[in-house]
């Protein structure tokens, strides 16, 4: 938890392995807190939106992107947006296409919120990002379970082949988790075991957010 966090804009980061349950926790907290916080005052931002633009590269080169390495992220833009939102300014968040392996032309106009939930695998690897957070969490789920979830997701939602998902996991996903993502767990204020269906952890997170807002 950063001392520099602005109490008028609470930024919660949920990090962890790919397919560990980050998005499920974020969406559950968002859905269940809307009535208490206000539906227009809590929202989610995915770190995936801040993958670097690769439109200057040919498609074959883009398909080789290591999405699990910190260098794949446009950290400067993410920081610029977080600081702008904390200052009460709106931002235009880029959208990323995993089909084209680059940013889309469309952006999402995002207005300041009382509570912003960030979710992504690499959020805690950058000290500058950590310094902008009000609270940080790491979802700790077994890697074999994460792989099964990722395999199902990538084949069903992203049209990937079984072979390509396995190859990516072997070459980049698992090695980068061990090198960058798992070590970043030490920076989390809260570690959530058992993935995205940990009801006790979700309730604790909701209570902490309300506490940060000065509500019971």
Swiss-Prot record:
Catalytic activity: uridine + ATP = UMP + ADP + H(+); cytidine + ATP = CMP + ADP + H(+)
GO cellular component: cytoplasm
Pfam family, one: PRK
Binding positions for ATP per the UniProt entry: 16-23
Intracellular or extracellular location(s): Cytoplasm
Keyword tags: ATP-binding, Cytoplasm, Kinase, Nucleotide-binding, Transferase
Pathway the protein takes part in: Pyrimidine metabolism; CTP biosynthesis via salvage pathway; CTP from cytidine: step 1/3; Pyrimidine metabolism; UMP biosynthesis via salvage pathway; UMP from uridine: step 1/1
Top EC class of this enzyme: transferase
Gene Ontology MF terms in the entry: ATP binding; cytidine kinase activity; uridine kinase activity
Annotated signal sequence range: none
Its EC number(s): 2.7.1.48
Annotated GO biological process: CTP salvage; UMP salvage
Primary location: cytoplasm
PANTHER family in the cross-refs: URIDINE KINASE
Family statement: Belongs to the uridine kinase family.
Protein name as it appears in the record: Uridine kinase
GN (gene name): udk
